[in-house]
Structure formats: structure tokens, C-alpha cells
Curated annotation (Swiss-Prot):
Belongs to the betacoronavirus nucleocapsid protein family. It comes from Murine coronavirus (strain DVIM). Residues 50-61 have a biased composition (Polar residues). Packages the positive strand viral genome RNA into a helical ribonucleocapsid (RNP) and plays a fundamental role during virion assembly through its interactions with the viral genome and membrane protein M. Plays an important role in enhancing the efficiency of subgenomic viral RNA transcription as well as viral replication. Residues 9-23, 193-227 have a biased composition (Low complexity). GO terms for cellular component: host cell endoplasmic reticulum-Golgi intermediate compartment; host cell Golgi apparatus; ribonucleoprotein complex; viral nucleocapsid. InterPro entries: N_prot_C_CoV, N_prot_N_CoV, NCAP_bCoV, Nucleocap_CoV, Nucleocapsid_C, Nucleocapsid_N. ADP-ribosylated. The ADP-ribosylation is retained in the virion during infection. The modification Phosphoserine is found at S162, S170, S194, S390, S425. This is Nucleoprotein.
Amino acid sequence: MSFVPGQENAGSRSSSGNRAGNGILKKTTWADQTERGPNNQNRGRRNQPKQTATTQSNSGSVVPHYSWFSGITQFQKGKEFQFADGQGVPIANGIPASEQKGYWYRHNRRSFKTPDGQQKQLLPRWYFYYLGTGPHAGATYGDSIEGVFWVANSQADTNTRSDIVERDPSSHEAIPTRFAPGTVLPQGFYVEGSGRSAPASRSGSRSQSRGSNNRARSSSNQRQPASTVKPDMAEEIAALVLAKLGKDAGQPKQVTKQSAKEVRQKILNKPRQKRTPNKQCPVQQCFGKRGPNQNFGGSEMLKLGTSDPQFPILAELAPTPGAFFFGSKLELVKKNSGGVDEPTKDVYELLYSGAIRFDSTLPGFETIMKVLNENLNAYQNQAGGVDVVSPKPQRKGRRQAQEKKDEVDNVSVAKPKSSVQRNVSRELTPEDRSLLAQILDDGVVPDGLEDDSNV
């Protein structure tokens, strides 16, 4: 008895037979379809049998097997496709845990030409196949194969192949890929069809596909108009948009005085308890100067606010809204409503007191203690007891510069020293010594040497 994904009861194995390469999927071009060029049209020709691994040509990109699930597309270069152990198997109704094993197959898609004439390679897309099915049906679980990543449920037996039927696209549509809660999707990848509108449009897409199947059967003998839409055209457009965004995103964003002022004003317009200080609106502008009642924040953290690299680890200690209301002592106090001329309004303050408890087993405990010790009561170690923001230097006008010049001109200059005073510090020559000895013998001291008693 074989299992059919998406059905509660197991069904019999179905055969895909000879089908046209375009299948019945209307909204998505899957990797198992031939990516045809715009000039290769099948209008007026009979349907060709599905290509296999031995019959597919080198031109184009063909995967000769139909996956039960939508693909996972890479949108960032240099990212590795991988899942943690026990994760990565898509969810499908009717498939027991013992059969949830298989591999993700990398489909290397074709390249396209951009409007400026450059050749762009579309990033690969990955498809899931159950163990014993798909392009590597004969491989053993865990074999080292280029472009294959093995995944399995923790309850699955990877020594035996899965008893899953192969998908017939004429009978079964591809299932949107979903994973068990807690599964971490590889970084740089997204699930096809996982947009915001995907859940709401599933029921509509099923009814539309049923109606389109009936119309296709009734008009199978009629000539179908040629489509002017190339396969993966949406992906080409998306790639162009991503390339454009990536180019623009690489340029540094310039913050002007006007934009910084707007950000600061936007923050200050919020209630005090909703403000988030940052570089544009530092801590003191949001909450006032540091002191006994607001005693946290060193000089660096006061400038950067929540942009400080050390702040995220402190945020781990912050209580949740539930812990704030249910784990604190709260007191509602009515405040004075202001001056006599101001309109009357009731002002209240919700006073709270509580504690945040942690111990040395907390991850990053030493770093947290270091940051706390540097910022608690840091205002006491600063000049004046509080952190005062130094005023901006004012530009000097021409008048102020002239006044400054006049002040310099009026400054009295000290009288220069006498020649003897200027020479006191230099070394004495033999002639100086002889003259000095003669002066001492005569008892006559020249002017300027009366105070030099040590000479």
C-alpha cells in the first residue's frame, strides 16, 4: 500500500505516462518543465512525450521528475542550503512520520539577458523528493551527491525507501511547502508561494484549476493561441528589481540635519514611556539629565542610546509587559494639572517598583555585570555630578572678530629684560669670570645684579 501526499487515505501508485512538457500547473513554472525560449512555440504540433534523464537535450534546463511540493528559491548569493538534524521534511496530510525522509535536489536554472546586455544567471531552486523517488531514486540515504541535501524525520527509518507514489501532474497539483513548527529555513532562501496572499488564494486557485481542467478537456482539439509570456518572466523581473535594490542598498544613506531634526521631533512627540533614544535623539533629550532619580547611563551610552553596542544585552533583562504589570507594585497618583491659564486636564502618574532577578548562570553574565557597573550612577563620576551637554560653539562674526583684535592690541606687553638679565642663564666665559672677580674685589655691583646674590 502506497501513500499519497495530501490525502488521508493511501492510494494506489499512479503512472505519469506520456504528457506534454507544460503539465497543468497554471500559476507556477516548476523545475520539472522545459524552459523554452520565446521562439520555440508548439502551436499546431502534437504534444511531445515527457523527457527523461537520458533523452533531455543539453539546451534548456529540465528536471525529469515532478516533486510533490513547491520549491525553495535562493535569493542571496553565497548562502548555503541546509537544515538542522530532524528538520527539513515538508508537511503533507496522509504521510506518517516513518515515511518522512528524502532529499532536496538543486535545480540550476537558466540565465537571461538584462536590458543593458549583460548575462545574468538565475539563482538555483531546490525541490524535495521522498527517499527512493526523483532524480536520485537509486541513491542510499546520506550518499555524497553534488546538489543533494538529505533530510529525515527523527522517527523515520532511513535504511528503507519511502512508500510514496510519484506525482502525476494531471491528477495532483503541487502542494505548497510547509514545515513543522520550529523549523529554521536556510538563510537567503524563500519558499515559493509563501507570500502574504498565498493562504487566502489557495481555495480560489483550486477551484480555478478544476474549471481550467474541464475547459482544457472540451477544447483539446482546438488550436490554442500562442502565449507571449516567457517562462520565469516574473523571476526575471524579480531578479532585475533585486539587482537594482542591491545596487542602491550598497550606497550609504546620507543623514542630513533636516532628517535628523525630523527623527528627533518624531521621537519627542511620543509619550515619555514610548520614546526610544538613539543618535539623533539622545537619552537626555528624551528623559532629562542624569541624577538620583534617573541614575543609569555613562557618557557613551547617553550619546548613542539604544544604538549603543552594549544595549542589546541589557535589553535581555528588560521585563515583558506582563511582568511589568503583574510583577511590580503599582500606584496611581494624580498630579497637578498645570497653571491657572492652562485648560483643565487630569494628569496621572503610574508609579511602579519591582526587581529583575538573575544569577551567574545567565548567558553573558560577566558582560552584563560589566555594563551595569559602568553605567549605574555614572553621573556621580562626571563633572558637576550630572552629565551636562556642552553647548555648540557659536560662529564668530566680523564684529566679534574685530573686537577680539582690539582687545589683543590693548594688551600691555611686559618690558624686555636687560642685557645682563638675558645673559644670566648662559655659561660664563673666562673673560666674564675675570670681570666678575674684579667687581667682587672692588665691591661695586652693576645695575641688574643686586638681587643675584647666588652668582
